[in-house]
Amino acid sequence: CIHAAGIPKGVVNILHGTGPVVGNELTVNPDVNKISFTGSTGVGKTIAKGAADTMKRVTLELGGKSPNIILDDADFADAIPKAIFAAYLNSGQACAAATRLLVPAKR
């Protein structure tokens, strides 16, 4: 999708691997100019500390999984599409992404 959109190779790079190995290398490597991370506060602190030595820019979205609570008297036809939109806004990459949906059991 990225290349089909006309974005040149190397502009966007997606790496898979464990945080202690790949994440650490990205954090301390001087060839990496910026890190954007969504996840726990503990990992965010580790990234910030490692990135400080190379003065790289860091964007952190830290926190937990936010619930979206729909009460029994809600208009479900209206609320459910909005809840799904909220969960996937910004591709779900936000500390406040409402990725848990709580509804009454009888609904």
Protein language model features and the residues they cover:
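PLP-dependent aminotransferase-like
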Residues: 1-23
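A general structural signal for stabilizing positions within well-ordered secondary structure
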Residues: 3-6, 26, 49, 92
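Well-formed, non-transmembrane alpha-helical positions, independent of function
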Residues: 25-26, 82
